[in-house]
Amino acid sequence: MGPFCLGCSHRKCYSPIRNLISQETFKFHFKNLRYAIDRKDTFLCYEVTRKDCDSPVSLHHGVFKNKDNIHAEICFLYWFHDKVLKVLSPREEFKITWYMSWSPCFECAEQVLRFLATHHNLSLDIFSSRLYNIRDPENQQNLCRLVQEGAQVAAMDLYEFKKCWKKFVDNGGRRFRPWKKLLTNFRYQDSKLQEILRPCYIPVPSSSSSTLSNICLTKGLPETRFCVERRRVHLLSEEEFYSQFYNQRVKHLCYYHGVKPYLCYQLEQFNGQAPLKGCLLSEKGKQHAEILFLDKIRSMELSQVIITCYLTWSPCPNCAWQLAAFKRDRPDLILHIYTSRLYFHWKRPFQKGLCSLWQSGILVDVMDLPQFTDCWTNFVNPKRPFWPWKGLEIISRRTQRRLHRIKESWGLQDLVNDFGNLQLGPPMS
């Protein structure tokens, strides 16, 4: 069966049951037990935002429950079609986030797939407390297909439970108190989900390798997940490079329009071995590429090495501080970071993060034509020349001046110049 608009195929209108649910309902139905056969109702807490380059604009939020043998996901799709798609411009782009007591069954996943296929202006994130009938091959297949269609599918972690409690529960001003074994059960649900989704991740070229592993953080940004998946690839496609490393002004580039944080790295060792290369991608709502990079380098236990990184965005404060701490613990390591764009460069916490990099001895600079060319040769296509886009060098010089002003405003120009004069090579015998 081909794609079709589910909303247009059904005239009955469904409405959310309410904006808030009781504390008892939430604790009973969203408890992430391994076995919950007595919980047959499905609750779906949703948030709809309009995509904007500066910040998402919240439009609707509420709660759906299965009704008249119609599952909560389908009720939402009917409602969304009538109350959002029919009212607002078809050129608008929307982000939908679901927090579900059960993951979608294979029939609902099929309907969601067809809905997404007919509405390309939507993105969907699905966080579920429990996995529904995970041994059923059809359920597994359709969860994979949701990911391949562009949806994000994940198990609810403590952060999602807290957010759900704050936004969708009549909490009376009380903080969310995790139930016993919440994190243990999350790790179980997450591991089962990763087993299901592992076959459907985008394959990398046959000449490269990919690794899947779990990484656990101690402290980070509020959005940081405790356990996330890592994907490592060696090469980017030409289309990816031109779209992701394009150094245009920020107002024309926003995450919702496909601009993602990439980190390409090359390690040169003093023992004469061939350089090691790789490319890491941050997924929205998950671990940042810089932290994945640190995890990779720590696992290699290197000492004297020169590392060159090419980033689509400069590091956020949390990543910058962790990079700086890593460098301070390894004074013999030389790390040079080139960035295509500066991330929130006008905000002082982000400037302070850049300062921590310089103060630790990390060299931070803006990508110009030589760096774009080197990145292309090493990570895209060494057999074809790099063709710069219009205005590349002009925009690079503007960004370099902006970075220079940040250095001067924090009184670090002399320090940065001293680091820039250091010998980048093996110690003299």
From Swiss-Prot:
The active site consists of: 73 (proton donor)
Gene Ontology molecular function, alphabetical: cytidine deaminase activity; RNA binding; zinc ion binding
Catalyzed chemical reaction(s) = a 2'-deoxycytidine in single-stranded DNA + H2O + H(+) = a 2'-deoxyuridine in single-stranded DNA + NH4(+)
Q: Which compartments does it reside in?
A: Cytoplasm
EC number(s) on file: 3.5.4.38
| Superkingdom per UniProt | Eukaryota
Instruction: Kindly give the SUPFAM superfamilies that the UniProt entry links to this protein.
Output: Cytidine deaminase-like
Q: Can you supply a Gene Ontology BP term from the record?
A: DNA cytosine deamination
Record keywords: Antiviral defense, Cytoplasm, Hydrolase, Immunity, Innate immunity, Metal-binding, Repeat, Zinc
Q: Which cofactor does it need?
A: Zn(2+)
Q: Which residues form the CMP/dCMP-type deaminase domain?
A: 38-154, 238-357
Q: Which residues form the signal peptide?
A: none
- Record carries keyword Repeat: yes
* Residue sites binding Zn(2+) per the record: 71, 105, 108, 288, 316, 319
Q: Name one GO cellular component term.
A: P-body
Q: Name one Pfam family in it.
A: APOBEC2
Leading EC class: hydrolase
Quaternary data: Homodimer.
- What does the record's miscellaneous section state? Probable human APOBEC3G ortholog.
Q: What is known of its domains?
A: The CMP/dCMP deaminase domain 1 confers deoxycytidine deaminase activity, whereas the CMP/dCMP deaminase domain 2 mediates RNA-dependent oligomerization and virion incorporation.
Q: What does this protein do?
A: DNA deaminase (cytidine deaminase) which acts as an inhibitor of retrovirus replication and retrotransposon mobility via deaminase-dependent and -independent mechanisms. Selectively targets single-stranded DNA and does not deaminate double-stranded DNA or single- or double-stranded RNA.
The UniProt entry's sequence similarity note says: Belongs to the cytidine and deoxycytidylate deaminase family.
Name by which UniProt lists this protein: DNA dC->dU-editing enzyme APOBEC3
**What is the name of the gene encoding this protein?**
Apobec3
